[in-house]
């Protein structure tokens, strides 16, 4: 399926910095609850992400990530997920997070 450039412009993809991470104990599949600061316009958003193979709460805090910020909220195992943190999904289902190659400002648009 093709989308137009106008369709793509509707997707709010932003840079954010991980502030807090904890294990989502209620999730069926191993997941982390991640709080990300997307800057003054978007603010702090929360996500439940299946990213436990390569990432722990300790090694994620302070890292910058890329997220889709304008999806509707979704309840995942008792957690309100407000943003989709983006990652590359390997053949075995492991997720490698997408991130800026250098430190940048929170809230910047990804195009």
What are these regions (language model features)?
Residues 1-111:
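Phosphate-backbone binding interfaces of nucleic-acid-interacting proteins
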């Amino acid at each position: 399926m093709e989308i137009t450039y106008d369709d793509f412009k509707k997707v709010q993809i932003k840079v954010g910095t991980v502030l807090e991470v904890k294990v989502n104990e209620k999730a069926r599949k191993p997941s982390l609850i991640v709080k990300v600061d997307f800057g003054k316009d978007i603010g702090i958003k929360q996500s439940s992400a299946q990213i436990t193979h390569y990432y722990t709460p300790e090694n994620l805090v302070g890292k910058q990530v890329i997220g889709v910020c304008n999806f509707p909220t979704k309840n995942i195992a008792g957690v309100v997920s407000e943003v989709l943190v983006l990652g590359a999904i390997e053949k075995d289902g492991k997720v490698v997070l997408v991130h800026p190659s250098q430190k940048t400002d929170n809230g910047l648009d990804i195009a």
